[in-house]
A protein has these predicted regions:
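Conserved functional hotspot residues or short segments at active or partner-binding sites
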Residues: 322-428
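Glycine-rich oxoanion-binding loops at beta->alpha junctions
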Residues: 112-165, 178
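Glycine-rich, aromatic-lined ligand/substrate-binding cores of catalytic
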Residues: 268-348
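Glycine-rich, charge-decorated loop segments at or immediately adjacent to ligand/cofactor-binding or catalytic sites
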Residues: 107-112, 202-225
Length: 447
C-alpha cells in the first residue's frame, strides 16, 4: 500500500472544526487548495521516534545502576531538540560520566580534518574525550581509568568529581548516509574498543536521511582502502541506519564482536523521506547544513580528491562546485545536456572563504535535486568529472590516493583520467551492490 494511502485512511475523521459546509463555501478556491496541501502534508508526516527517545522513555532504564559514556555531537537531541547529554546527566538511576566526540568534536564546531583535543564541559561537569585527535579509537584509559587520565588537566576544577571508568557506552549520532562520512568509522572504532574492554554498547538508532532502499557507488575494497572515510567494505551510499550498520559490523567485520544492543526507531520505514519523519534536521557537521547537502554528498565528496572546489568555504558546500578556470555557463550547459535523472544544474559563481581556491572567483554550477527518488549522486558526479575533463583536459587533476581512498577502489580514477568508457566499471559496481544487498539483509531492522 502506498504511504499516502496508509496515512490518509487513519488520522482525519469527521469535519474539521470551524470548516462546516457553509464556511467552506466562503473560502476562496486558492485558499482551499493551499489548505488541502497543508492537510496532506500533515497526514503524510510519520510519527518517527528515535532510539534516544526510546531510551528516555524506558522504565526501568536498561542503563540502571551503570556508569555511562556517551559518543555524541550536536545531533544527539530528542524529537523536541533537547540535548540527550543534558537529559542523561540529570538522571538518578544511572550516572553519565564522560562524553566522546567524533570528527568536529562533541560541540560540532571544528572544521573538517581539524584535530580536536581533550576538553572539559563546565555546564555538564564532564570530560570530553576526542576521537578525532591523537586517536580515532577510545584508548583503554579513556574507558577504564578516566580519573587517573584527566585529573590535573587544564580547565578541570580541583574539586571535580571524576568516575574511575564506564560500565556502558551509548552511541547517539545522526549519520549522513555515506560511507565517506567519518561517523560510520567512529562507530566501528568505538565498537571495537568496547569489545576489547568488555564494555557493552547501546546504539540509539536514527533514520538514514537518504532512505534505506537505494545503494550507490563501489563497495570498498578491503583492506587496501580502509581508513576512517571507509572503515568497512560497504558501498558509498549504503542505505542503512547506524543501528543496522552496527549489527552488520558486529556480525561480519569485527574481529571480536561487541556486546551490542540497538534501540530501534519506531515509525520509520526504508522508503520514508527524512522530511516525512517529523524529526528536526540538526547539522551533523559544519559543512552538512541541509538535507540537500546530504543528498549530493555521496558523489560530490569525491571532488575532495581533485583540484575542483567542492564548495567548502561557501554557504552551499557540495552543492556548489567549480574552479577559477571554469566557465560556468559552458559547463552548466554541457551538464544539463546529459539529462541526468532527478537533477538540474544552474550556472554559479562563488568565492570560497577557505579551503581550495580560497579568495578566488570560481566558475561552476550548483546541483539542484529535482527528484530525490531518481537522483543518483555518485553516477552524477562521475559524469560531471567526465564532462569537466572533456571541456578542460589540461586543467583537471586528481589527487590519486585521496580520490581512491574516498572511492574505495583504484579502478575508477584511471578511467576518468584517460577519458575511457565508464560503462564496464559501473556495471561491475552494480553487481557488487547486489551482492552487498544480500549480505546486509539479515541485519536490517525495518521494512
Amino acid at each position: 500500500m502506498p504511504h499516502s494511502e496508509a496515512f490518509i485512511r487513519g488520522p482525519i475523521r469527521g469535519p474539521i472544526r470551524g470548516l462546516g459546509p457553509r464556511s467552506w463555501g466562503r473560502v476562496g478556491r486558492w485558499s482551499r487548495i493551499a489548505l488541502g496541501w497543508c492537510l496532506l502534508a500533515t497526514v503524510l508526516q510519520a510519527e518517527v521516534r528515535t532510539g534516544a527517545d526510546a531510551l528516555l522513555a524506558a522504565d526501568p532504564s536498561p542503563l540502571r545502576g551503570r556508569r555511562v559514556g556517551l559518543v555524541t555531537n550536536p545531533t544527539g537531541v530528542t524529537r523536541d531538540l533537547e540535548s540527550l547529554a543534558l537529559r542523561l546527566r540529570q538522571r538518578k538511576d544511572f550516572e553519565l560520566v564522560a562524553l566522546y566526540g567524533p570528527e568536529h568534536g562533541v560541540r560540532g564546531n571544528a572544521q573538517a580534518g581539524d584535530k580536536v583535543g581533550f576538553q572539559w564541559d563546565p555546564v555538564l561537569g564532564l570530560p570530553l574525550f576526542s576521537l578525532y585527535g591523537k586517536t580515532f579509537k577510545p584508548t583503554g584509559p579513556m574507558l577504564t581509568n578516566i580519573a587517573g587520565m584527566v585529573r590535573g588537566s587544564p580547565g578541570i576544577p580541583t574539586n571535580a568529581v571524576l568516575a574511575e571508568r564506564i560500565d556502558a557506552m551509548v552511541f547517539d549520532i545522526q549519520d549522513a548516509g555515506s560511507r565517506a562520512y567519518t561517523y560510520v568509522g567512529t562507530l566501528s572504532k568505538v565498537m571495537e574498543a568496547c569489545a576489547e574492554h568488555g564494555i557493552p554498547i547501546w546504539v540509539l538508532d536514527r533514520p538514514n536521511p537518504l532512505g534505506g532502499v537505494v545503494m550507490e557507488g563501489p563497495v570498498l575494497e578491503a583492506p587496501e582502502w580502509v581508513s576512517l572515510v571507509g572503515i568497512q567494505p560497504i558501498p558509498m551510499r549504503h542505505g542503512m541506519t547506524v543501528g543496522e550498520l552496527a549489527r552488520l559490523f558486529n556480525a561480519r567485520f569485527l574481529a571480536r564482536p561487541a556486546a551490542l544492543t540497538v534501540l530501534p526507531l519506531t515509525g520509520w520505514s526504508r522508503s520514508l523521506e527524512f522530511a516525512q519523519t517529523g524529526l528536526p534536521w540538526v547539522m551533523p557537521s559544519p559543512n552538512m547544513p541541509t538535507l540537500d547537502t546530504a543528498r549530493v554528498y555521496p558523489g560530490q565528496v569525491l571532488l575532495e580528491g581533485t583540484n575542483l572546489s567542492e564548495g567548502r568555504g561557501t554557504t552551499r558546500p557540495f552543492e556548489l562546485f567549480g574552479a577559477p578556470w571554469i566557465q560556468g555557463r559552458e559547463l552548466t550547459d554541457a551538464l544539463n545536456a546529459l539529462r541526468l535523472p532527478g537533477v538540474v544544474f544552474r550556472e554559479a559563481w562563488f568565492t570560497p572563504s577557505f579551503s581550495k581556491h580560497r579568495g578566488e572567483l570560481c566558475g561552476g554550477s550548483q546541483i539542484h535535486v529535482t527528484d530525490a527518488a531518481r537522483f543518483r549522486s555518485v553516477t552524477t558526479t562521475l559524469r560531471l568529472l567526465q564532462t569537466v575533463r572533456r571541456l578542460y583536459p589540461d586543467r583537471l587533476t586528481f589527487q590519486g590516493p585521496t580520490f581512491d581512498r574516498l572511492m574505495g577502489t583504484a579502478t575508477v580514477r584511471p578511467l576518468l583520467e584517460s577519458g575511457a568508457d565508464l560503462a564496464p566499471a559501473l556495471a561491475r559496481i552494480e553487481g557488487d551492490l547486489k551482492a552487498f544487498d544480500a549480505l546486509r539483509q539479515p541485519h536490517l531492522l525495518y521494512p
